[in-house]
Amino acid sequence: MGDFLVAREPLQPSDTVIVLAGNSIYRSQYGATLYQQGLAPRVIVSNEPVRTHGLDSTWWELKQLGLSSIAVPDDAILAITEVSGSTFEEAQHSRDIMRREGWHSAILVTDPFHTRRALLTFRSVFEPAGLTVIPAPAEGSKYKTDGWWRDPDRGIRVIQEYIKLPYYLIKRQI
């Protein structure tokens, strides 16, 4: 059950890495790693508020202050300026940036338990626009496909994903 949520495909060079919003440092760290490995010359990040450790900022502001884990030069980062209330909206905003920049391919970084729904969502938005996306589950994440039910936080996340999958299907967002 935990394995199904994790989507993996071989990584290949792309036009950009997209790091999805969320309060997981592993996403931004892995996005930076993929950039540093030369898999993409640009990184798209969300500019959502940071709601962890009592911070009142955004990921982009933290990056500019040198406090973010995204070790990527500022000129290689594009921030989604619109507020995204869902993975579907992040996909739409990312698609718009990619069209504007003339890009065609992306590597999608998110937590492992989120990759299945995120990939289906992004493909539903990207494919009609002629764009491609490859999933990249964030390395270093504490999510484990076995024994997830033993940890209340992980258990809640898995259950939430299994609720969101049919919801997104019904809403035609995947």
Residue ranges and their predicted role:
Residues G2-R150:
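A structural signal for short, hydrophobic/glycine-enriched beta-strand patches
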Residues D151-I174:
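A transmembrane-helix-recognition feature enriched in membrane-embedded lipid enzymes
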